A protein has these predicted regions:
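Conserved S-adenosyl-L-methionine
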Residues: 151-162
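Short, glycine-/aromatic-enriched active-site segment of Class I SAM-dependent methyltransferases
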Residues: 118-134
Length: 180
């Protein structure tokens, strides 16, 4: 919804995104926003129906490709992407550490990970309604996961607070793979 859109619009200031991986890409709205700023965008989602909806939505954009599969174990060679976006992908991750390690593997040296995720909450009914598999994360927890996956965390903070119940907060994090 509006949280990832606000974050993505702020990130539009990044020039020349290069080759982009969009994890848990959903129906392709985010990919459509960043495609004009990228050499290529690869959308990954576990749902074939969602991938088909994204393919239909973005059929007129030539630099976007689609992959149905598990974001925790992707078939791409190491160092394939300049940027990995995980806009609420962690909400659907059964193993956040593994997902971040996979993102690190797929980034080129100096590449950047940008993620957004709900801050820790207690709304289990919402979690179930949206097929989330966890109740979010705290900033310190995310920073530790990023470091443990080999990233240098550059930013990790609450960037959005909803003004009505259940008052969800969104954490946005940016991290970089070392240039070595």
């Amino acid at each position: 919804g509006r949280s990832w859109e606000a974050t993505s619009r702020a990130l539009m200031t990044l020039l020349s995104l290069g080759d982009v991986l969009d994890l848990a890409s959903g129906d392709g709205v985010f990919a459509g926003l960043i495609a004009p700023h990228a050499r290529s965008v690869t959308c990954v989602d576990i749902s074939g129906a969602v991938i088909n909806a994204a393919r239909k939505r973005l059929s007129d954009i030539g630099n976007v490709s689609f992959h149905e599969g598990d974001m925790h174990q992707l078939p791409f060679p190491p160092a394939s992407f300049d940027h990995v976006f995980a806009m609420h992908a962690l909400s659907f991750s059964t193993d956040a550490a593994n997902l971040l390690t996979e993102a690190h593997r797929l980034l080129r040296p100096g590449g950047r990970l940008v993620l957004a995720v709900l801050r820790k909450h207690s709304h289990e009914e919402t979690m179930r309604a949206f097929d989330h598999v966890n109740l979010g994360f705290e900033e310190a927890e995310l920073q530790a996961l990023l470091r443990g996956s080999g990233f240098v965390a550059q930013e990790c903070s609450v960037t959005s607070r909803e003004s009505r119940p259940p008052y969800f907060e969104v954490i946005t994090a940016m991290a970089r793979r070392e240039k070595t």
